[in-house]
Regions:
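P-loop NTPase motor domains
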Residues: 1-4, 8-10, 61-73, 79-81, ...
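Glycine-rich phosphate-binding loop of nucleotide-binding enzymes
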Residues: 4-77
């Protein structure tokens, strides 16, 4: 009886997942069954029915069209586009030398993960101490200075080169490809509107070398956005295609 009703009832049954104890969901189906179409339909409904924000991690760049339709932001992550996300971006105008808000500490922890990906191996205790020292110096100097600026990876690289330890030079050498080399897409100021209500991160064109670092930077940016939205009482819908 129940299966017969499901076959004959071709109406779209829409529920508000935000009212559930756990509103997470999965979309399953064989290729060509309409999974992406269903997600796009739900995204449109969410976007038009309130002020919730939508973020999409798009491994095949197939959600660019709907983002552009709704005036959203498309961030095409690759070495040959001019879309940049600065991993060191922070509200430097809210910094204080004592790091009372923990902003520098959180960025230091993120940079440990980023440097580990660039080096390609686990960090030892000396490397961790050097990286943390350089991150703290970079942001504390900005906090104490009269003119505020958002640092980029080359600023961090320069501070590493100033350190007396040989390990600091080794870390800087591992970062060189991603700072001054051909994979330097993260050595730029952010030039895309990641605060848009509808943001799609396209990752189809990433190479194997850049993919792990890009995922780390992208997830850091997304996490910061979700936390900020939570403080404002705004819901965030995160879609991860081809999970």
């Amino acid at each position: 009886m129940g299966s017969e009703m499901c076959i004959r009832d071709r109406n779209v049954n829409i529920g508000n997942r935000k009212k559930l104890i756990n509103g997470n969901g999965f979309v399953f189906g064989v290729p060509g069954s309409g999974k992406s179409f269903f997600c796009k339909m739900e995204m449109g409904s969410v976007f038009l029915s309130g002020d919730d924000e939508i973020i999409v991690i798009d491994p095949m760049n197939e959600y660019f069209d709907i983002a552009q339709t709704y005036g959203g932001t498309v961030v095409n992550m690759s070495t040959y586009t001019d879309n940049y996300v600065n991993p060191l971006e922070m509200d430097v105008w809210s910094l204080d030398p004592n790091d009372s808000k923990g902003m520098i500490r959180e960025k230091g922890e993120f940079m440990l993960g980023l440097c580990e990906q660039c080096i390609g191996d686990s960090l030892n205790s000396r490397q961790k101490s050097i990286i943390d020292r350089c991150v703290r110096k970079m942001y504390i100097d900005i906090a104490r200075g009269r003119e505020k600026y958002i640092p980029v990876m080359s600023d961090f690289y320069d501070i590493l080169m100033e350190q007396p330890e040989d390990e600091a030079k080794d870390i800087a050498l591992s970062l060189e490809l991603f700072v001054n080399g051909s994979l330097n897409i993260f050595n730029h100021q952010t030039n895309v509107d990641v605060d848009n209500r509808f943001t799609v991160y396209g990752i189809r064109d990433l190479g194997t070398e850049l993919s792990p670092i890009t995922m780390l930077v992208m997830m850091e940016s997304i996490q910061n956005r979700i936390v900020e939205n939570g403080k404002r009482g705004k819901a965030t819908w995160l879609y991860i295609d081809e999970f």
